[in-house]
Amino acid sequence: MQAVALPEEICWLLEDTEDFLAEGLQNENLSPGAQDQRAHILRGFQQIKSRYCWDFQPQGGDLGQDGSDDNLSGTHGPPLTSEASFWSDYQDEGIEDILRGAQELDSVIKQGYLEKKSKDHSFFGSEWQKRWCVISRGLFLYYANEKSKQPKGTFLIKGYSVRMAPHLRKDSKKESCFELISQDRRSYEFTASSPAEARDWVDQISFLLKDLSSLTIPFEEEEEEEEEEEKEEEEMYNDVDGFDSPRSGSQCRAMALPEPTEKEEDIYEVLPDDDDLEEDTCGAHRRRVDYADYYQGLWDCHGDQPDELSFQRGDLIRILSKEYNMYGWWVGELNSVIGIVPKDYLTTAFEMEGI
């Protein structure tokens, strides 16, 4: 949806109003009714901005961004078309994540304090502003602090590239800088607490970008294979119909059908019933397998840290613990090796109906 350009005075008024409700009243002792009304108005701000691709900024930008930021183009008007299309794609999955507070997000890949560079800071304001930053479900969200109830800005990571950027600063923190850049969207510059922390942010974002770009590849390959198989079957049936139909002036000939091939392997595994449990040499029943603990890898995953478990697509992994579920990680076992695995890379291996 094309965003409607608002007059500059209205943009700043709406932005100041939203900022006062979100930050100015955050620690005030409000009555329950006032708190509900404050939350209701803030949700209305976010829903309208998302629905109409509005930023309440005369210069465009990302959803709910800082008042000191501006658009890559530096001109007045709505956000770039590509930015609006990105948000319209994400809205199909809902806007719940965009409205959540810093402590309410799930599937968090990386979070922590960073200094974010402002595109157009005020005379008395700092060029670098401290923000609580979170990567979750393909989104990069930044908050005023780790207890904020709504983000000051949000953007989709897909379509960006990330790199270390020591050229952003001239002081002692220059080796701790990194940036996200795109050809048709605004760029984002950050400073971490240390060079090692900055490299970890770059590595995590790079891994996520690689994962997002490869999500459609397996589906496309399987779809092409299915289309080829359907085409071959259709040609075979057409040949059979041609021999069955009567032809004038000719005698029907017997068609030599191909020999039946061996029975194709069933792609589903047959689970044993409780009555089929075998007995060992001592006559005792073997321990019953809990199939609900087994998950299958959706994609290849190469662990970057010693405590991360590496696996390939299709590997059968036994989940030992979901203690770190809130961080998006489980504890799994593969080939007697134990490590943490990203839960978004797994799917249930067995159907539990009738077990």
Curated annotation (Swiss-Prot):
<dbReference type="GO" id="GO:0033634">
    <property type="term" value="P:positive regulation of cell-cell adhesion mediated by integrin"/>
</dbReference>
<dbReference type="GO" id="GO:0033625">
    <property type="term" value="P:positive regulation of integrin activation"/>
</dbReference>
<dbReference type="Pfam" id="PF00169">
    <property type="entry name" value="PH"/>
</dbReference>
<feature type="modified residue" description="Phosphotyrosine; by FYN">
    <location>
        <position position="268"/>
    </location>
</feature>
<dbReference type="GO" id="GO:0072659">
    <property type="term" value="P:protein localization to plasma membrane"/>
</dbReference>
<dbReference type="GO" id="GO:0002821">
    <property type="term" value="P:positive regulation of adaptive immune response"/>
</dbReference>
<dbReference type="GO" id="GO:0001954">
    <property type="term" value="P:positive regulation of cell-matrix adhesion"/>
</dbReference>
<dbReference type="GO" id="GO:0005911">
    <property type="term" value="C:cell-cell junction"/>
</dbReference>
<dbReference type="GO" id="GO:0001772">
    <property type="term" value="C:immunological synapse"/>
</dbReference>
<keyword id="KW-0963">Cytoplasm</keyword>
<dbReference type="InterPro" id="IPR001849">
    <property type="entry name" value="PH_domain"/>
</dbReference>
<dbReference type="GO" id="GO:0005654">
    <property type="term" value="C:nucleoplasm"/>
</dbReference>
<feature type="compositionally biased region" description="Acidic residues">
    <location>
        <begin position="219"/>
        <end position="242"/>
    </location>
</feature>
<dbReference type="GO" id="GO:0045785">
    <property type="term" value="P:positive regulation of cell adhesion"/>
</dbReference>
<dbReference type="GO" id="GO:0019903">
    <property type="term" value="F:protein phosphatase binding"/>
</dbReference>
<keyword id="KW-0539">Nucleus</keyword>
<dbReference type="GO" id="GO:0002250">
    <property type="term" value="P:adaptive immune response"/>
</dbReference>
<dbReference type="GO" id="GO:0042169">
    <property type="term" value="F:SH2 domain binding"/>
</dbReference>
<dbReference type="GO" id="GO:0034116">
    <property type="term" value="P:positive regulation of heterotypic cell-cell adhesion"/>
</dbReference>
<feature type="domain" description="SH3">
    <location>
        <begin position="290"/>
        <end position="351"/>
    </location>
</feature>
<dbReference type="GO" id="GO:0045944">
    <property type="term" value="P:positive regulation of transcription by RNA polymerase II"/>
</dbReference>
<feature type="region of interest" description="Interaction with FYB1">
    <location>
        <begin position="286"/>
        <end position="291"/>
    </location>
</feature>
<comment type="subunit">
    <text>Homodimer. Interacts with FYN. Interacts with PTPRC. Interacts with GRB2 when phosphorylated on Tyr-268. Interacts with FYB1, which is required for SKAP2 protein stability. Part of a complex consisting of SKAP1, FYB1 and CLNK. Interacts with RASGRP1. Interacts with FYB2.</text>
</comment>
<feature type="region of interest" description="Disordered">
    <location>
        <begin position="219"/>
        <end position="252"/>
    </location>
</feature>
<feature type="modified residue" description="Phosphotyrosine">
    <location>
        <position position="237"/>
    </location>
</feature>
<keyword id="KW-0728">SH3 domain</keyword>
<dbReference type="GO" id="GO:0050852">
    <property type="term" value="P:T cell receptor signaling pathway"/>
</dbReference>
<feature type="domain" description="PH">
    <location>
        <begin position="107"/>
        <end position="210"/>
    </location>
</feature>
<protein>
    <recommendedName>
        <fullName>Src kinase-associated phosphoprotein 1</fullName>
    </recommendedName>
</protein>
<dbReference type="GO" id="GO:0044853">
    <property type="term" value="C:plasma membrane raft"/>
</dbReference>
<dbReference type="GO" id="GO:0042101">
    <property type="term" value="C:T cell receptor complex"/>
</dbReference>
<dbReference type="GO" id="GO:0005886">
    <property type="term" value="C:plasma membrane"/>
</dbReference>
<comment type="similarity">
    <text>Belongs to the SKAP family.</text>
</comment>
<feature type="region of interest" description="Disordered">
    <location>
        <begin position="64"/>
        <end position="83"/>
    </location>
</feature>
<dbReference type="InterPro" id="IPR001452">
    <property type="entry name" value="SH3_domain"/>
</dbReference>
<keyword id="KW-1003">Cell membrane</keyword>
<dbReference type="InterPro" id="IPR036028">
    <property type="entry name" value="SH3-like_dom_sf"/>
</dbReference>
<keyword id="KW-0597">Phosphoprotein</keyword>
<feature type="modified residue" description="Phosphotyrosine">
    <location>
        <position position="142"/>
    </location>
</feature>
<keyword id="KW-1064">Adaptive immunity</keyword>
<dbReference type="GO" id="GO:0005829">
    <property type="term" value="C:cytosol"/>
</dbReference>
<dbReference type="InterPro" id="IPR011993">
    <property type="entry name" value="PH-like_dom_sf"/>
</dbReference>
